[in-house]
Amino acid sequence: MLGLAAEENVLRIHIDELVFGLIAFAVIFALVYRYAVPRVTKMLDERADAIEGGIERAKKAEAEAEELRQQFQEKLEEAHRSYAAELQKASEQSAAIIAEAREEAQAEARRIIEAAHAQIEADRQQAMAQLRAEIGALSADLAARIVGETLSDPAAQSRVIDRFLAELESGANQQAEVR
């Protein structure tokens, strides 16, 4: 019987222990609820705020980065446009300089050619004058030898020389026409 009585005690619930256990549980629950829960809640709220703040800061940083990227892209495009404009301007200036240099070279070439023609004409006139003088002297000597008298009158010498040269030129022109 002892064994049976002992088994009954094990299954039997003692009210005083149950009440004491419930009171102890309620006190511990109240203390945890009063002191620990607010601290944990506060810590969780702070952590949530920190996470939300981090997310907001990340979004802000991302927005700022995007804005900076767009500004950089705009400046880069502006630099490309400016470069293209400067390149076009330099190309136009070089074309203008080349055209101006070409015109100056052509003008200089025309001036040199005209000066050469003028010099050739002056040399020809000078040679003709010298030739006339020499031919005149030679023809006067020749006429004096043939006729036997000298042409001392300069006007007469000039007429003889002019007539002789005219005959030479007409003979040269006739030969040129025959060819």
From Swiss-Prot:
<dbReference type="InterPro" id="IPR050059">
    <property type="entry name" value="ATP_synthase_B_chain"/>
</dbReference>
<comment type="similarity">
    <text>Belongs to the ATPase B chain family.</text>
</comment>
<dbReference type="GO" id="GO:0046933">
    <property type="term" value="F:proton-transporting ATP synthase activity, rotational mechanism"/>
</dbReference>
<dbReference type="InterPro" id="IPR002146">
    <property type="entry name" value="ATP_synth_b/b'su_bac/chlpt"/>
</dbReference>
<keyword id="KW-0812">Transmembrane</keyword>
<keyword id="KW-0472">Membrane</keyword>
<dbReference type="GO" id="GO:0005886">
    <property type="term" value="C:plasma membrane"/>
</dbReference>
<keyword id="KW-0813">Transport</keyword>
<comment type="subunit">
    <text>F-type ATPases have 2 components, F(1) - the catalytic core - and F(0) - the membrane proton channel. F(1) has five subunits: alpha(3), beta(3), gamma(1), delta(1), epsilon(1). F(0) has three main subunits: a(1), b(2) and c(10-14). The alpha and beta chains form an alternating ring which encloses part of the gamma chain. F(1) is attached to F(0) by a central stalk formed by the gamma and epsilon chains, while a peripheral stalk is formed by the delta and b chains.</text>
</comment>
<dbReference type="GO" id="GO:0045259">
    <property type="term" value="C:proton-transporting ATP synthase complex"/>
</dbReference>
<keyword id="KW-1133">Transmembrane helix</keyword>
<keyword id="KW-0375">Hydrogen ion transport</keyword>
<dbReference type="InterPro" id="IPR005864">
    <property type="entry name" value="ATP_synth_F0_bsu_bac"/>
</dbReference>
<keyword id="KW-0066">ATP synthesis</keyword>
<comment type="function">
    <text>F(1)F(0) ATP synthase produces ATP from ADP in the presence of a proton or sodium gradient. F-type ATPases consist of two structural domains, F(1) containing the extramembraneous catalytic core and F(0) containing the membrane proton channel, linked together by a central stalk and a peripheral stalk. During catalysis, ATP synthesis in the catalytic domain of F(1) is coupled via a rotary mechanism of the central stalk subunits to proton translocation.</text>
</comment>
<keyword id="KW-0138">CF(0)</keyword>
<dbReference type="GO" id="GO:0046961">
    <property type="term" value="F:proton-transporting ATPase activity, rotational mechanism"/>
</dbReference>
<keyword id="KW-0406">Ion transport</keyword>
<protein>
    <recommendedName>
        <fullName>ATP synthase subunit b</fullName>
    </recommendedName>
</protein>
<feature type="transmembrane region" description="Helical">
    <location>
        <begin position="13"/>
        <end position="33"/>
    </location>
</feature>
<dbReference type="Pfam" id="PF00430">
    <property type="entry name" value="ATP-synt_B"/>
</dbReference>
<keyword id="KW-1003">Cell membrane</keyword>
<comment type="function">
    <text>Component of the F(0) channel, it forms part of the peripheral stalk, linking F(1) to F(0).</text>
</comment>
<dbReference type="InterPro" id="IPR028987">
    <property type="entry name" value="ATP_synth_B-like_membr_sf"/>
</dbReference>
